């Protein structure tokens, strides 16, 4: 069986959805963190492999970006699901922050895509996907090994993602207003 960059992209998304449902939504943060970290590294391979094989192109970029959004949503939705179903003093914070983080994480990517479709650069942002995933991964480990910091991590993720969206809006506005 031949391994292709697109195959790695699909596999990474499917694995992330599985990890989210099987472990994160159940509060199994340690195994979830270990697998999330491992498959996060595998996710880096598709683009690298495509460039090495000379097969990188618009289709692969589109597929990777789209499935990355699905993966991101699966992780955050699984965490929201977990906190909806437990009774803790911080579960309401986790749910609200998770919803905001989900929306703003998706808006971060949308802002870049829309800017690029208008021939504007969108190269700013304090919390791009790598930073968001690193924050989630570290928070899963800390929550599993020490104390539950995930509600606060989701709050930080919501704030950082919101700041990133605002940065992108302002950055793109400068370009598009100057072009007009």
How should each PLM-predicted stretch be described?
Residues 47-90:
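Basic, amphipathic juxtamembrane/active-site segments
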Residues 1-35, 40, 74-180:
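Hydrophobic alpha-helical transmembrane segments
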